[in-house]
Amino acid sequence: GHLAYQVSPSVQLKCGQEPHHWGQGWRSLWMDRQASPLPFASLQVRLKRLEYTHLIARTQHLGVGSPPAIPTNGRNHPGSYATRRGAWMAAHAVEVELGRGWKGALFGAVTWLNNDSGYTHRFEAAYALPFISFRPTEYAVGSADNALMGASLSWAPRWADERLLFYSQIVLDELVVSEIRSGDGWWANKWGALGAIQWISPNRMWRLVAEGAAVRPFTYSHASNVQSWTHRNGPLAHPAGSNFIEGRLHMQWKRNDWKVRLGCVWMQQGMDEPTPLGVTPNLTVGADPLNSYITRPADYGIDLIWDGGGLIDQAGIQENMRWWGDIAFSLPPLEG
């Protein structure tokens, strides 16, 4: 939940702890609703054709190996979390109505260590300033923080009466154009893309959503897992992490108090070799943002979906299809 204060008709301050979802897609490559609730404070500015959000949040990263069950016996509970390392993140997005049903948005984010360069409980005040660019600020403060950038574009045709929506979203973790042109599969070309179509029937009873997403290996990761784009040992963005391709189709039928939903999700993802809980693999294919990119086995030859190129034992590509459905009935409110 959260607390909000309306400073003016166009400015709102908010703080609390809850999940966030940035974007119009079912999934988000920036911040996804499936992530753990995030302690945060935010500023929102809404004008006629522009909306700006600036968010500061505290992330937590858990280590396996618990404190003793009883302080005097020295035993640990396997599989529980003993160490909790904190980090900070800042994110902002500006969305603009471009006219004729078009909307565009720009996104920026940065994560930084709570303890860095000998400073404990470090809060970088520069990142809390609204309307700044995080990447130049990162260079200015002289710290190797983890920055992300992104953009989105959507179109809701006016003739469709808000029943049709085309939506796209990209995220850039790191990108060198010359390395893309070379075609050598450089590991640090880290990006993701998402596209979706939403359709609602004229009688508003049917709704269809088709969406596809792809994220290259090692996207969202960092040399230190505490600076990765994660919170409480899970991704802040798409729950699959990276090194995957996904397609989904959702259908909903609603009439009076009845609602029926059906969906299917297909995914192909490069997977690391299995390891015990809390044990980081010696080499990684870049699917889990919690694994440091330092443990990559190669710098080149990294495909969009990568199985390790035969350099990692028991690593491979996993493909699966999931179906789901539910039926709901809304009870009328009680009177009296």
Map each language-model feature to its residues.
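Residue-level recognition of beta-strand termini and adjacent short loop/turns
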Residues: 8, 99, 332-334
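Short, intrinsically disordered, charge-balanced linker/junction segments flanking boundaries
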Residues: 325-336
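Well-ordered mid-protein domain cores that form the structural environment of catalytic cofactors
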Residues: 1-53
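N-terminal polybasic phosphate/anion-binding patch
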Residues: 258
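Signature for the C-terminal beta-barrel architecture of outer-membrane proteins
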Residues: 10-12, 40-249, 254, 266-326
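Long alpha-helical segments found as membrane-embedded helices
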Residues: 262-264
